[in-house]
Every structure is written in structure tokens, then in C-alpha cells.
Amino acid sequence: MAIERTFSIIKPNAVAKNVIGSIFARFETAGFKIVGTKMLHLTVEQARGFYAEHDGKPFFDGLVEFMTSGPIVVSVLEGENAVQRHRDLLGATNPANALAGTLRADYADSLTENGTHGSDSVESAAREIAYFFGEGEVCPRTR
């Protein structure tokens, strides 16, 4: 299988619960290498730009408000079939449908405050990584 990169966000509600280390441990236990990470507090402009595909949808303003309500942790994960494996670890977007043992089952508070984000395709991952990480900020660790 090919090595892929995927993009992950630990959202404000999960950061506030002080579970960053627990989530990182689960990434590593699942076989991912964390090849880039940083904590930041999104501006409204950054959040609107990142979620631009949802502009005009009924939940958009609430999503932007939530994502700017506190710090987030953005990360680049590397591994075999990383996009799908990461999504499996996250669980269903709606935590009510998330299987036990997934990150959203464990850390989500609601559909909007679902604790985590993960890229839905290799193409989305590349776009999302480039949105938050510049040249030289992602360090390959595959060996």
C-alpha cells in the first residue's frame, strides 16, 4: 500500500478537555506518524476560508463561531491508507452514530462540536495541509 498523508484538527471542545495527548497517543497506537503539528486560534477569516465549501449552508455561521471559540491543534499524519484509516479512527461525523472506541464517541459533544476533523480524500488532505502548513513545516518520518 502507498504511504499517504492526511490532515487532522483537534477542535476547540476537545482542546478544552485537555485530551490532546490522549488523541495523539491514539494516532500513534493506530500506526500514524505525526509529521507536522501546531496549535493556533483561528480568526474568523481563516475559519471562513477553510470551510468555504459550506458557505451558505444553515450551519455555516455556527461552525465558524465554534471553530474560532478557542485554540485548535492541526496535524499532518502519515501512514498507509492514512485518509481512510484516520476517518475510521474518528468515527461518524454525527457522534450519535459513532461507534464505541472512536474519537468522536469519546470526545464529541454534539454534531458541530464533534471534537475532531479529518480529510475525506487524498486531494482534500493536500489542500487542507497546504492551508495551514508552509514549506518546510511538515517533516517526513517514513522509514
Swiss-Prot record:
Q: Which family does it belong to?
A: Belongs to the NDK family.
PROSITE patterns, per this entry?
NDPK (PS00469), NDPK_LIKE (PS51374)
Q: Where in the cell is it found?
A: Cytoplasm
Checking InterPro entries in the record gives:
NDK-like_dom (IPR034907), NDK-like_dom_sf (IPR036850), Nucleoside_diP_kinase (IPR001564), Nucleoside_diP_kinase_AS (IPR023005)
Lineage, top-rank taxon, reads Bacteria
Cofactor(s) needed, names only, are: Mg(2+)
Which Pfam family is an annotated match for this chain, by its short name? NDK
Q: Which reaction does it catalyse?
A: a 2'-deoxyribonucleoside 5'-diphosphate + ATP = a 2'-deoxyribonucleoside 5'-triphosphate + ADP; a ribonucleoside 5'-diphosphate + ATP = a ribonucleoside 5'-triphosphate + ADP
Identify this protein by name: Nucleoside diphosphate kinase
Enzyme class, top EC level, equals transferase
Q: PTM details?
A: Phosphorylated, probably on Ser residues; monomer and dimer are both phosphorylated.
Q: How does it assemble?
A: Homotetramer. Monomers and dimers have both been detected.
E.C. number, please?
Answer: 2.7.4.6
Phosphoserine occurs at which residues?
S119, S121
What exactly does this protein do?
Answer: Major role in the synthesis of nucleoside triphosphates other than ATP. The ATP gamma phosphate is transferred to the NDP beta phosphate via a ping-pong mechanism, using a phosphorylated active-site intermediate.
Which biological process terms from the Gene Ontology are attached to this UniProt entry? CTP biosynthetic process; GTP biosynthetic process; UTP biosynthetic process
Per its UniProt record, what SUPFAM superfamilies does this chain match? Nucleoside diphosphate kinase, NDK
UniProt-recorded Gene Ontology molecular function terms: ATP binding; metal ion binding; nucleoside diphosphate kinase activity
